[in-house]
Amino acid sequence: KIKKHLIGQDEAINTITDAIQRASVGLKDPVKPIGSFLFAGQTGVGKSLSAKILANELTKSSDSLVSIDCSEYSAEHEYAKLIGAPSGYVGFEQGGMLTNAISKNPFSIIVFDEIEKASHKVHELLLQILEEGRLTDGKGNTVSFNEAIVIMTSNVGVNEIDAITKSIGFG
């Protein structure tokens, strides 16, 4: 079904569906996310759209897509919005946008859009999600990501690759 919405992305779709199928039969690390993927390419090739279509086809719910625009997290302190402010700080009671979303709907597609624009603190959170499969929010609650699919998008290096392929006679 996904392939009829996304033309020319068969390899990416097959890779994602293979990961989901492996997870459904228990052939994945029980702690880590179902899969983690880096979609790299020029603006407009369907990186973010792929994630939206995947979320709609898998869950039939828009609540299952957690989209994080990493340009909003370029300042070092902004990462607290994802996991919640520590106790004693303003907004502590609200929790974090990412941890709240995963607590409510563990089977989610999380998109870190333009990951290269995020601060190193967001990269550290992402590493913890991918390595350990969990985060601790500002309230001290542990949130598991073992039923989530993590997608990062980027267009870093695309111009360089285009220049190389054109210089050797392709394109």
Task: Identify what each model region corresponds to.
Residues 1-171:
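AAA+ P-loop NTPase nucleotide-binding core of proteostasis motors
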